[in-house]
């Protein structure tokens, strides 16, 4: 990759405010990119509809990997592999979406140690060490750098086909991504010379496409269109997302979201462990054979697996569908749990659902289809979308809408009312996570809670921000922290500490903190405003250091205010 691909553009170059001087009369084009764990796609609004771009091999779906076998790294956009096994020699890094923004204590990182490239951990809460095998030596890199190299190739491919510079992009992301992971995605885009208009949860992008289809159907039927409830189930190689959306007249309101980092990679690893001989390391040949078996089991009751492992070791096994489903029972149970949770959070029953939309590669697995159809009490799956293209089409639509492009036929008169996928709150009441903005709150959102001191004459308070759903802070993602100083001396429980959180339409989170005293109508010290997240690397170290340094001396407890 050219040196420029590794250069992070300056802040001014990534504002997205510059326009191409060569084409001043043309509206800014925004790409829609769906970067999947195993493959990606890229699309753009061409003036009348969404157009999915193809690579030089005429493929809409592009494998998500970067090879380091030469001095110049090459991604799946430009690099053509002679055989699938070339990606499994250690010289290629893939599954980068599963690794971006994760620390080395994360179970997903530990599961990635089975991959052909090097993944090392110290288990102390810092970024894992990853490396590719180049000329019999390990070359270190980061998931963000790998993602940036891949994004550069996508951008260059798009610019070559569109014959104009491209800067703006809408990327789809998993529901379960933390804000720290989102900032890492944005950083990779900046390294690739792209300005992020929006990081869009994948089911939200699909909901936008669904809203457009319902709007067009309503126009064709000359009606106003009644509200339709849909469940969106999206399961790819690395993540599983669920959403309940209410759609009417081109407006899609996300009523609930749920997500988990489970996907086809987990199913693949389970299958490999099942068919591999005892003490046999997972080789590239075994991975390819297991993947092929899973694909064939979508329309066959059993498959024959033949793998020559070398040195006289061979695998010859028949794998039937029931056996495959038993091996992956926990994954399928998690899929069911997510849908049940999402329906419960949306306060709807399966019988209330008008359409069941299933997308992503794993949506073809018969067991997955059966489970989700049963939970949603649907006999049929919505056939209006391509399961492998729905997310990128929705992202391209959002790119056109956000860019202010007008369509005379009204096909871009669309709006998605988003919801917060994870709760945001503070550490208080000991080691408890106290949500300030609950999960599935409509965005934009602004909420506050009151806390108070735990020590007499406590002059400072530590405001520690977390994101997640766990009851204790250790179960959640640390976003950042700051100190509130200048609290007037008073008995514990007297000062009122107001913590306000604000999430705007672009999903930016700001935290405000103020100190009030009895009899005072205004803050006694200046209000503090901090944009989150503030923590970069070293989540584990930060949390541990805060405990060692301050203990419970600057803690807060929830204040029960008299109404």
Swiss-Prot record:
List where this protein forms a coiled coil. none
GO terms, biological process: response to heat
Q: One matching Pfam family, short form?
A: HSP70
UniProt signal peptide: none
Modification N-acetylalanine occurs at:
2
Q: Which controlled-vocabulary keywords does the entry list?
A: Acetylation, ATP-binding, Chaperone, Nucleotide-binding, Stress response
Example GO molecular function: ATP-dependent protein folding chaperone
Q: Region (Disordered) spans which residues?
A: 1-25
| Nucleotidyltransferase found in the keyword field | no
User: Which InterPro entries does UniProt cross-reference here?
Assistant: ATPase_NBD, Heat_shock_70_CS, HSP70_peptide-bd_sf, Hsp_70_fam
Family the entry assigns = Belongs to the heat shock protein 70 (TC 1.A.33) family. DnaK subfamily.
Q: State the protein's purpose.
A: In cooperation with other chaperones, Hsp70s are key components that facilitate folding of de novo synthesized proteins, assist translocation of precursor proteins into organelles, and are responsible for degradation of damaged protein under stress conditions.
Q: What is this protein called?
A: Heat shock 70 kDa protein 8
Origin species, per record, is Arabidopsis thaliana (Mouse-ear cress)
């Amino acid at each position: 990759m050219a040196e420029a691909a590794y250069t992070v553009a300056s802040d001014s170059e990534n504002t997205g405010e510059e326009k191409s001087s060569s084409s001043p009369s043309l509206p800014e084009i925004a790409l829609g990119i769906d970067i999947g764990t195993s493959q990606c796609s890229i699309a753009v609004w061409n003036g009348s509809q969404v157009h999915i771009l193809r690579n030089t091999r005429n493929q809409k779906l592009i494998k998500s990997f970067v090879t380091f076998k030469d001095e110049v790294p090459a991604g799946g956009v430009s690099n053509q592999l002679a055989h699938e096994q070339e990606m499994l020699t250690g010289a290629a890094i893939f599954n980068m979406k599963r690794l971006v923004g994760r620390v080395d204590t994360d179970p997903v990182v530990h599961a990635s140690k089975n991959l052909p490239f090097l993944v090392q951990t110290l288990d102390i809460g810092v970024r894992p060490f990853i490396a590719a095998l180049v000329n019999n030596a390990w070359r270190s890199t980061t998931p963000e750098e790998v993602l940036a190299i891949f994004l550069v190739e996508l951008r260059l491919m798009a610019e070559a086909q569109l014959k104009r510079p491209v800067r703006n992009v809408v990327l789809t992301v998993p529901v379960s991504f933390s804000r720290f992971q989102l900032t890492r995605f944005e950083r990779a885009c900046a390294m690739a010379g792209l300005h992020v208009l929006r990081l869009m949860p994948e089911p939200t992008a699909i909901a936008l496409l669904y809203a457009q289809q319902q709007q067009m159907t309503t126009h064709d039927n000359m009606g106003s269109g009644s509200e339709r409830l849909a469940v969106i189930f999206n399961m790819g190689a690395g993540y599983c997302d669920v959403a309940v959306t209410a759609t009417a007249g081109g407006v899609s309101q996300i009523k609930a979201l749920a997500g988990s980092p489970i996907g086809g990679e987990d199913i693949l690893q389970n299958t490999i462990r099942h068919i591999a001989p005892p003490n046999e390391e997972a080789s590239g040949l075994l991975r390819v054979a297991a993947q092929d078996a899973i694909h064939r089991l979508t329309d066959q009751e059993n498959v024959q697996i033949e793998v020559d492992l070398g040195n006289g070791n061979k695998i010859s096994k028949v794998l039937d569908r029931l056996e495959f489903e038993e091996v992956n029972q926990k994954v399928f149970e998690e899929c069911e749990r997510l849908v049940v949770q999402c329906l419960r959070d949306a306060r709807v029953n399966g019988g209330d659902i008008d359409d069941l939309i299933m997308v992503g590669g794993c949506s073809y697995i018969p067991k997955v289809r059966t489970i989700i159809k049963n939970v949603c009490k649907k006999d049929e799956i919505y056939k209006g979308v391509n399961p492998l293209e729905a997310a990128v089409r929705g992202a391209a639509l959002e790119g056109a809408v956000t860019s202010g492009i007008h369509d005379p036929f009204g096909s871009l008169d669309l709006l998605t009312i988003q919801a917060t996928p994870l709760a945001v709150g503070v550490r208080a009441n000991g080691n408890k996570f106290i949500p300030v903005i609950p999960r599935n709150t409509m965005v934009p959102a602004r909420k506050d809670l009151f806390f108070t001191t735990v020590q007499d004459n406590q002059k400072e308070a530590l405001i520690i921000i977390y994101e997640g759903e766990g009851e204790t802070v250790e179960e959640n993602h640390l976003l950042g922290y700051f100190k509130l100083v200048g609290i007037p001396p008073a008995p514990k429980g007297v000062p009122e500490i107001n913590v306000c959180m604000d999430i705007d339409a672009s999903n930016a989170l700001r935290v405000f903190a103020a100190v009030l005293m009895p009899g005072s109508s205004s803050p006694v010290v200046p209000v503090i405003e901090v944009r989150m997240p503030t923590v970069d690397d070293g989540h584990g170290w930060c949390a541990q250091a805060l405990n060692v340094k301050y203990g419970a001396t600057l803690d807060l407890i929830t204040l029960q205010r008299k109404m």
